[in-house]
Amino acid sequence: MEASLAVIQRPQAGASNTVYKSGPLFISSKGLGWTSWKKRWFILTRTSLVFFKNDPSALPQKGGEVNLTLGGIDLNSSGSVVVREDKKLLTVLFPDGRDGRAFTLKAETLDDLYEWKAALEQALAQAPNAALVIGQNGIFRTEANNTIEASFNSWRDQRPLKSSVVGRPILLALEEIDGSPSFLEKALQFLETYGTKVEGILRQSADVEEVERRVQEYEQGKTEFSPEEDPHVVGDCVKHVLRQLPSSPVPASCCTALLEAYKIDQNEARVNSLRSAIIETFPEPNRRLLLRMLKMMHTITSHSSENRMTSSAVAACMSPLLLRPLLAGECDLEGFDTLGDNSAQLLAAANAANNAQAIVTALLEDYGNMINDEGLGRCSTSTDSHIGDSGPENSSDEEEIVVKHPDLHTLDIEEGETDDDNDVLLSRKPSESSDYAGSDLYDYKGFGVEDSDAESPRDIHCSVESTDFSARVKKHIEEPIKDIEVSSVSPTENCYQSGREAIPSVTPSTPLTALRYTTSAEKPASKTTGSSTVNSKRSSSWGRGNGKKTPAKGSFDSSGNDELLIQRLEHMKDELRQRIAKEAKGNAALQASLERRKQALHERRLALEQDVGRLQEQLQAERDLRSALEVGLSISCGQFSSQAADSKTRAELEEIALAEADVARLKQKVAELHHQLSQQRQHHLSSLPDAQSHHQFLHNHNTQLKSFQQDFDSILAFVNHERNQRTDETSLRADWRNGRGNNRQVPGSPSLNAASLGIPMEEYSPVMDYGRHHHPPATSAALMELTTRLDFFKERRSQLMEQIQNLDLNYGSSSSSLHRSSSPPWN
């Protein structure tokens, strides 16, 4: 347990007391829950290690200031020294007292570290025997401005030695040893029933005297909460019980895990990480207590419209009680230096409080998912499953767990100590979960009253049925047990141990890998004998491990050791078999899924191969068609091979040839007509003598114009008629290719023959023959081009007719003016 902080005065070391070494060392100083190091001058003698603010042998202080002794340690021969090189830490361990003492100092250099180690070992070898030293309180006093006032110690000494409400281990926080609800559980149920509609519940404080009175009434027999009670008083009772737990509801290593999980940016990933941290790092009793508190808080926040307590408000009230190590400075917060001045420490403390509130808020908002989680929902209410408690329990003369001294040299300080700032120098209880300055305030163990049988919870635990310890800790075994020593246990002691937890590891997160159990072979003959035996031998531990007492001499049973080891190995074997079977089942499912995937891919590959083959065939066919069309366009109809393309393609080529011949003939006819018109116009302009001849010219010109228009329309009608008749000629084209088509003539309208169009027969026949024997190849694009050309010719014809009419009008106006000028004067 942590050494008493009561202030005492020590005399200066006498001349007869040899000084083994003197020099500077660093001690820890507490302020605002944060640890820092201060340099002090230490003097080591055979009986004590005292320290001063400055070197006492130096010059007198300014202004006549007296350099008094600030504190010290009483030495005895049972002490040992542990060195940690990486942080230059020096720890003095004493197994004497109820739970042992541990004092941590820090050297400036490694040379100083080993010099102090050698000097301490020499002094401890010459120190008085522990059994002969009077008043083994192990006082290690610190400066008054950095410690809790001595009034706390006197207040603590006046507390009852044992309470059924406060100061109980986390294992018994929610239920009594017989399975009935505890004070805390009943208070939580009351708040869930009657406190959800009370405004400011958990935030508004009640009178301290009423809270103390209600706790005393419960201890005196009033074990039920009535609906008439003040919910604010009950809420403060819950806070009071949590505040006075011997250890934090959430251990330091678990706080660190929650803090790391909360740093994740994505909300979903952060929630999953928080759940995993609770499942993997929390001991079973701590997890049950945290989930129970979250359930009550979630119920309160679900009625926030009535009580005005949101998740953030409830988290602000309860996070300092649940995440005690985080606010005590045991978790590494990046970007904040706890060794700075008061303002830096205030900022660090505020940041820690904000992080704690944010973590609890996130847990409250995700409470529904966590309850539905298989790992979190599997919380047994049996005391046999509560083996993972990280907090200390009331020491007992019958519970004996030995952590041998050689192992202490290989142990590390708790995981939460990430730097020198978090190493605690003050002596403390080895099982203490945090450096919370007031934690000693809530430890209701007797001081110096070790011979009282009423101080042991043995009588309470005797009502629990004795069970095999391996069955209770099987879920916490993660590594093989390396060294187990078990001796026979008396019925009373076995009954007591069955309801207890055992954590021999240094940190709450360390697996149970080195358990050493020894118990007394016989009951104490008397209270005095049991007390003297306990005082003579004590176990020592380092950091956060539980410090328990050594067994009586000569009480080892190798058969029990082998039996327990065999049982645990069998359990591990069964668990490994189950894991192997589970993995094999999962692998079989994955293998089946892989086979299905392979089959689907094979079928898909075959389908794609078929599609590729079909598309290649289509591509080849299109290429062949393109080649045939290109060949057809490059040769004449007579040279076109019948094997190069089908009948449809040949018909299109012939039709295109006819259309091109018609267009060429029309162009020639238009050119001839235009030339004739120009000649006639010039002739008439030069040969008109008078108005009568001019009138005759206009009449003849109009007649010729009409004849020209009729001829042009006849030509276009002939072309259209030819296009309509080409459909009928399809059946005759086979005969034309065999040579029989030369004797046939295309039927036509009697009005649309060569004579009616004014075309000589010798000119018309070659055109027709050319159209029937020299048909170039064609495509759909060529047909569209032909249609476009015909439309263009129509538009061109209209333009020419308009030009001819304009010329006629101009010619008429000029002739009229000439006629008026040549008229006789009498007109």
Swiss-Prot record:
A cellular component annotation (GO) from this entry: cytoplasm
PROSITE patterns membership: PH_DOMAIN (PS50003), RHOGAP (PS50238)
One protein family per Pfam: PH
Keyword Coiled coil included in the entry's annotation: yes
Coiled coil: 560-684
UniProt keyword annotations, A-Z: Coiled coil, GTPase activation
Biased amino acid composition, Acidic residues: 413-423
Site entry (Arginine finger), positions: R203
UniProt keyword Transmembrane present: no
InterPro entries documented for this protein: MIP1_Leuzipper (IPR025757), PH-like_dom_sf (IPR011993), PH_domain (IPR001849), Rho_GAP_Regulators (IPR052799), Rho_GTPase_activation_prot (IPR008936), RhoGAP_dom (IPR000198)
Compositionally skewed regions (Basic and acidic residues) per UniProt: 401-412
Residues of the Rho-GAP domain: 172-371
Ranges for domain PH: 18-125
Any one GO molecular function term: GTPase activator activity
Name of the protein described by the UniProt record: Rho GTPase-activating protein 6
Lineage of origin: Eukaryota, Viridiplantae, Streptophyta, Embryophyta, Tracheophyta
